[in-house]
From Swiss-Prot:
Region (AF-2): 470-480
Alphabetical GO biological process terms: cell differentiation; positive regulation of fatty acid beta-oxidation by octopamine signaling pathway; positive regulation of fatty acid beta-oxidation by serotonin receptor signaling pathway; positive regulation of transcription by RNA polymerase II; regulation of transcription by RNA polymerase II
Residue ranges of the region described as Disordered: 24-66
Residues covered by the NR LBD domain: 233-480
Keyword Transcription: yes
Name this polypeptide is given: Nuclear hormone receptor family member nhr-76
Annotation: DNA-binding region: 75-155
Amino acid sequence: MEVLGKQKVLAMMKLNGAGQLTGYPFETPSSSTTTPSVPPSFPHSSNPNAYMKPSPPSAISSPPSTSSCSSASEKKECAVCKNPNSSGYHFGCIACAACSAFFRRTVVLSRRYYCRRDPVGNSLCPLDRRHRSNCRACRYVRCIDMGMNPSSVQNLRDSIKPRSPAEMIQEAEEEDKKEKLDDILFSAATPGSWISSTSTCNEPLPVAPKEIPGENYIETLAALYKNSVERRRMFYCNGSLREMLGGTGLKMRPTRFDERYYKEKMRFELVLYVEMMNSMSVFRQMDLDTKETLVKGCAVSLAMLEKYYISVKYDGLRTQKLIAPDGSYTDLSDHGAQFDDEFTQITESVMDKETCLKLLYDPLRSCLNELGSALEHSRMTDTEFCALFAILLFNTAADNLSDASRNAVVMARNRVMKDWFEFYAKQGIDPHEAGLLVGNTLLLLTAVRNAMAVHRENFHVIRVFNVMEYDKLIDDLAFT
């Protein structure tokens, strides 16, 4: 056993009336299990603490007595996670077995963590008995702040023969799984826990998705969205082969009254969105139920957002034209003049033109002015659209998500935020300006939600009064 300095020994242990060492065990960089011997008595002095440095809470603070002996046997809470059942001093501070094992694994395996809540590195995540496994980066920072010393950790401690890196990693993963299971069982019986009280051991443990080195979600989405625009141009091109191959831009044309919900158009657009979602490894790794829940909750919102984004991009806010991805537009400034011929040809219309315009098109004008103005003010580009695409996809408030799936969605959204800032940094954008761009983009969510409510009411009128035929797939997208 390594001989510790006199001041450190007294700061970590207590002396009872008989001169025997009592209190909490402490770890030293040694594999020896022998009981430490009683240190030699110190010279008498009128002030026994004169040569001592300030001590931690367990240091000598009063003359030995019966009460002090009884308090020495009481448990102290872990300095890291506030677990009341600490196991003593570990690597320099009072800690529980779980936190000391976590610290040892981190140092031995040379692990590096980052906080998904704050990529800058500030420790913002809650750290207590229930949430200590949520963010390893903040947990390790807390360990260091509380006094744990990485140099006190010995590699291959208590090992008879050298272990391979694969064996060490496997052992660490098993310990992580046991700790998470212990946290789940604790949280199931604790009020206010983020885990449902109905959680059982059979429920899948929340695990961090496997990450591909160098993958940036925003960069991937932006590249794929650019390809999707080109695919749309070729798919919706009604011209010659030369026009299709020549890269002619988006052609504007007035839309038909009943064209908005064509079957072929809706399914093609949904395929493009799913391709963008599958480009992110975190989405591909999710189970089918989670994917279905997330897509149902965001598909219509994404289609609506992109329509207004395209409208602003092609000056639709000034001309009061709502432009679809295929180039068809609805002129909201002519009071439905573009549909005069269609209304005259309909012999058994369920409602007259004035009523139809009042219920269906006047609300769209309000949405264009509100959401379109917000998009223009935020200076949205393809980058911000793709970032908002991912934010809407990874909706942590989505219904019918299990605890494990919801935790994976939270980690995915935090990863999106991190990659968003990193993408701006690669482009040489100042961090302050990047923060403004991110903040202004996130503020659009309120306008998106308001516009979505109007479109939902709009479609409800169409469905109830059978104003036009629509693809029944939309009923499966949580739009009704």
